[in-house]
Amino acid sequence: MCLLALGFLLGILQPASGQFPRACASSESLLRKECCPLWAGDGSPCGELSGRGSCQEILLSRAPLGPQFPFTGVDDREDWPAVFYNRTCQCNSNFMGFNCGECRFGFSGPNCAERRMRMRRSIFQLSTREKNKFLAYLNLAKHTPSQDYVIATGTYAQMNNGLTPMFRNISVYDLFVWMHYYVSRDTLLGDASVWRDIDFAHEAPGFLPWHRLFLVLWEHEIQKITGDENFTIPYWDWRDAEGCDVCTDELMGDRHPTNPQLLSPASFFSSWQ
């Protein structure tokens, strides 16, 4: 699943995300260039014994890159995730995930065959209790380490081509902060040089659908840590807004009264790092 989001923009470059399944962060996986973890339900890679998926060679786009990125072979995100892995789980039917252990969005049940509809509501339609629950869920995600994913703290070259993995733990909330940063950051050219004239997150043809997938995945991870399968992210319709209607201390936080770079100390989020 997290080997899906980043490349929707990048190959838009190729299906994946900037984060790595914990099960694939070992030197063994990197040296084999294979990310096909066992599914706990049957103990086979990608749940193959149960027909969930199989370990397959990744398919790379042959479309040329745009002129705004005049490099080849300098960025780990090119042809993602081929720099790190060339075999990943390809899931069947309504299964998804790095080991095909979960259901595609909109499906549930032991065989992922049951349709599940959820409704997203305007944040201004939520009751006080519902708003407080939403904020509590965000706070839980901020302080809950991700069980499934880690983030890279170095490039593939810095990892000695997989021989010395460089990963660290991260919270569920910060995983998505990092994912968004990873897909949009500058290209590192080596020798402290960077190419700044690129933003795969916001200057690529997948801008809208990638961000939608990004939010649905974030929503899914919060459902998992809270056990609330009915949780949905509320939306803010700002089409006619004359200001930031959600920038209040009851919602996403007002401005600090003396420092416009900070949140109001009365905000739920003012203590976040």
From Swiss-Prot:
Protein name: Tyrosinase
Record-linked PROSITE patterns: TYROSINASE_1
Name of the encoding gene: TYR
Biological process annotations from GO: melanin biosynthetic process; pigmentation
GO molecular function: metal ion binding; tyrosinase activity
Source organism phylogeny: Eukaryota, Metazoa, Chordata, Craniata, Vertebrata
Sugar-bearing residue positions: 86, 169, 230
Record field: catalytic activity: 2 L-dopa + O2 = 2 L-dopaquinone + 2 H2O; L-tyrosine + O2 = L-dopaquinone + H2O
Domain of life: Eukaryota
Membrane-protein topology: Single-pass type I membrane protein
Source organism of this protein record: Pelodiscus sinensis
Signal peptide: 1-18
Pfam families: Tyrosinase
Coiled coil (residue ranges): none
Cofactor: Cu(2+)
Family per record: Belongs to the tyrosinase family.
Disulfide bonds listed in the record: none
